[in-house]
Amino acid sequence: MQVRNARGQLGNGYAHDAKTSSFNKFFDLFAVQWILLCNFAIDIASAELPFGYANRAVSHGGPVWMRIVEQLKLTKMYEHIVLNEPHASMEGLYDAEKSFWNIDADFLNNVVIKWTDWHTDYLFHGLQDSRIRTVRFPYSRFIVDAERLWNDPMESIGQGIVYKEFEDYRRDIPSDLEQHLLNLWHWHQDRLRQALQEGALLLDCHSFPDDLSDVDICIGYNEDWSKPSDDIIDMAVNHFMDRGYKVGVNYPYSNSETPDCDFGYHSLMLEVNKKTYLKPGSILLQDDGLRDDITAFQQRLLMGS
């Protein structure tokens, strides 16, 4: 598998309004009853077949009984979740060997404060569970963008792994120190690989400025081997719609982080609009409403919750 489809591109997906979810509520109740009735089949299937076999069995045909059992198996969700938090920090901006930005009030107010994923390392940590692991990048994205691709297309405008330009600001980095910064990207990718395992879900944790879109919650994924099942994506959309959020699918951002691994796992991005949890014109938290909703979502993602 190759590293591909990193988050960070504006998406061309679609948005759901909470008003359209009444039918989904009825369907969810029916689905829960169906899952309970078929629990025995799920247990039998999970004991013998490896992660990813379900999608292969369905897409390539196979015996009818296998297709039915494998589809049931998908309802078991995940045994492990890895939280990827690459943009939650401001560290390094005043480090003489890492920053190289001409920092002034405008840069902090209009660039750093706007594009830092404030408090995502708090919002996604409401559920204390040994099955959830966190990989938080400890430096600002304006030091190293740990989620860019190697040879990312954004490099052409000075916003690859190591930003050289951002809006009207420029950054001149000595070549030897730039290599040190690139090593931080490798370090973050290695930590993600070590945290992941067969069949896990990587949950890509982000926020975005409220002037970018009126969408409250953006759910993103890749159209490749890392895409969760349609059932899981639908569950994610309905979970937040039923709580009154306007949900975008691969909009306004698309894709999700996929570090190179030699085993199968899924990746799902969750972007939250800053207006849903920050006080207007501030980086102060409103309350724990969104955090509680994310916690409930994580509980649904975990097997047996």
Predicted segment positions?
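N-terminal amphipathic/hydrophobic targeting modules at extreme N-termini
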Residues: 48-51, 57-64
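Hydrophobic, low-acid, alpha-helix-prone terminal segments
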Residues: 4-7, 11, 23-30, 40, ...
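Hydrophobic alpha-helical signal/anchor motif
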Residues: 1-3, 19, 32-35, 42-44, ...
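N-terminal catalytic or cofactor-binding beta/alpha core of small enzyme domains
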Residues: 65-202, 207-305
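N-terminal helix-forming leader/targeting segments
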Residues: 14-20
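Short, positively charged and aromatic/hydrophobic N-terminal segments
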Residues: 29, 35, 39-42, 50, ...
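Absolute N-terminal positional cue centered near the fourth residue
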Residues: 4-6, 37, 69, 80
